[in-house]
């Protein structure tokens, strides 16, 4: 997969520009940053596995996400630190706790909000903690993400099998209505297809966000 090679080149470039101790992976338990974590840990790159991983926990997290973060700790044999709060406040806290940090590796994709013009290497905006944002997955589509997950048996949160396609927290996320299986006259409970079955996914991925 050419996009995978491009992503690994970006990660390699990051490791040539910064020491592993100067970078961290921003992790939220979602599919995109899980693919990012897997790429970094499967890559045969010097010091790649030394890059710290930080779980930015929202105010009202799904228990399934919490469980999945623990599963990733075990699956990859890594320490995942936890920082609570919104992303800006979390980054401020992270940088105060470890002033040597200079770069944040993220799972952002071009179809994500405010990412249309994002570059693979781009500094944070004014008013934010000063970091280089590194975006190895920028050109991946939602279909690319799911193809990689299924081809490489990458673990993912159970919510995705229940129709959730873009996961925030319990106050702003519902199953994607485009995956709803209508109940028949028997009165059976409404169900949802898995996230990886969503058609035109880059367009409808966030339809379950409130």
Residue ranges and their predicted role:
Residues 1-210:
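Nucleotide-activated chemistry modules centered on ATP-dependent adenylation/adenylyltransferase
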């Amino acid at each position: 997969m050419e996009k995978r090679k491009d992503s690994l080149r970006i990660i390699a470039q990051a490791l040539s520009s910064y020491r592993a101790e100067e970078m961290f992976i921003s992790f939220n338990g979602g599919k995109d940053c899980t693919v990012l974590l897997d790429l970094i840990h499967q890559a045969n790159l010097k010091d790649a596995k030394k890059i710290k991983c930080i779980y930015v926990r929202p105010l009202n997290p799904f228990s399934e996400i919490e469980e999945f973060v623990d599963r990733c700790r075990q699956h990859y044999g890594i320490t995942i630190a936890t920082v609570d709060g919104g992303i800006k406040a979390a980054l401020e806290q992270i940088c105060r706790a470890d002033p040597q940090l200079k770069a944040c590796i993220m799972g952002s994709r071009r179809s994500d909000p405010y990412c249309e013009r994002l570059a693979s290497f781009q500094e944070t905006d004014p008013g934010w903690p000063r970091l280089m944002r590194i975006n190895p997955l920028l050109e991946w589509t939602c279909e690319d993400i799911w193809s990689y997950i299924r081809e490489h048996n990458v673990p993912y949160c159970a919510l995705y099998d229940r129709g959730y396609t873009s996961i925030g927290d319990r106050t702003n996320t519902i199953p994607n209505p485009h995956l709803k299986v209508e109940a028949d006259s028997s009165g059976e409970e409404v169900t949802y297809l898995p996230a990886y079955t969503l058609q035109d996914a880059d367009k409808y991925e966030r339809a379950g966000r409130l």
